[in-house]
């Protein structure tokens, strides 16, 4: 089996990948993550996932490189990482009582052959109606400023959800393991 490399510095993705009990290393790619004019949210996350994997190919020949990227979509608007309390507060106020779809782009690049599998896995959450007090309590407790849409689903963020719909709950955290296992199997990698 070619060595696995996770093209990410995300602790959340690292924890998810470790669930497969396969040895892997991590390396953070340096790419421009800007949204291109006219680019759909699906095209954006697929492109960024592949670019993250390809950015490490020359320095990691003969590896299986996993790239992933996620955005949240509210209506027609892409909402990314808020980075600040005020932006997170506004994102959650906007999402109150609405449906938010998380799109997670996933790429598995065989840097030996150049073959790359790319997909996008959606996961929808229906938000509870949230007031400012609840939002601020959540933000102070969780500080989800590095999470798309200000939702930290692996923590208290799940308390903001009324219901969820999707084929792979791990995609909500940023690495869709069910789809990744399919891709790994296509490369001849069996999970324990």
Swiss-Prot record:
Signal peptide: none
Site feature Important for substrate specificity, where: 12, 70, 154
UniProt-listed CDD domains: Maf
Keyword Cytoplasm on entry: yes
Broadest EC class assigned to this enzyme: hydrolase
Locations listed in the record: Cytoplasm
Pfam assignment, any one: Maf
Coiled coil: none
Assigned keywords, A-Z: Cytoplasm, Hydrolase, Nucleotide metabolism
Hydrolase among keywords: yes
Catalytic activity: N(7)-methyl-GTP + H2O = N(7)-methyl-GMP + diphosphate + H(+)
Gene Ontology BP, a term: nucleotide metabolic process
EC nos: 3.6.1.-
GO cellular component: cytoplasm
Active site residues of this protein: 69 (proton acceptor)
Gene Ontology MF term list: nucleoside triphosphate diphosphatase activity
Cofactor list: a divalent metal cation
Similarity field: Belongs to the Maf family. YceF subfamily.
Function: Nucleoside triphosphate pyrophosphatase that hydrolyzes 7-methyl-GTP (m(7)GTP). May have a dual role in cell division arrest and in preventing the incorporation of modified nucleotides into cellular nucleic acids.
Protein name: 7-methyl-GTP pyrophosphatase
Organism of origin: Pseudomonas fluorescens (strain ATCC BAA-477 / NRRL B-23932 / Pf-5)
High-level lineage: Bacteria, Pseudomonadati, Pseudomonadota, Gammaproteobacteria, Pseudomonadales
């Amino acid at each position: 089996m070619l060595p696995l490399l996770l093209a990410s510095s995300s602790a959340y993705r690292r924890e998810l990948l470790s669930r497969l009990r396969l040895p892997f290393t991590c390396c953070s790619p340096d790419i421009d993550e800007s949204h291109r004019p006219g680019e759909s949210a699906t095209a954006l996350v697929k492109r960024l996932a592949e670019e993250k994997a390809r950015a490490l190919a020359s320095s990691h020949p003969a590896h299986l490189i996993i790239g992933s990227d996620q955005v949240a979509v509210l209506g027609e608007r892409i909402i990314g990482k808020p980075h600040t309390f005020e932006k997170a507060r506004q994102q959650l106020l906007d999402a109150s009582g609405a449906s938010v779809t998380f799109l997670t782009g996933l790429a598995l690049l065989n840097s030996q052959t150049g073959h790359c599998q790319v997909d996008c896995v959606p996961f929808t959450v229906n938000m509870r109606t949230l007031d400012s007090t609840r939002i601020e309590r959540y933000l102070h407790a969780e500080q989800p400023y590095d999470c798309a849409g200000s939702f930290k689903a692996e923590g208290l963020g799940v308390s903001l959800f009324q219901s969820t719909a999707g084929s792979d709950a791990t995609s909500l955290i940023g690495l869709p393991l069910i789809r990744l296992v399919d891709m790994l199997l296509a490369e001849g990698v069996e999970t324990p």
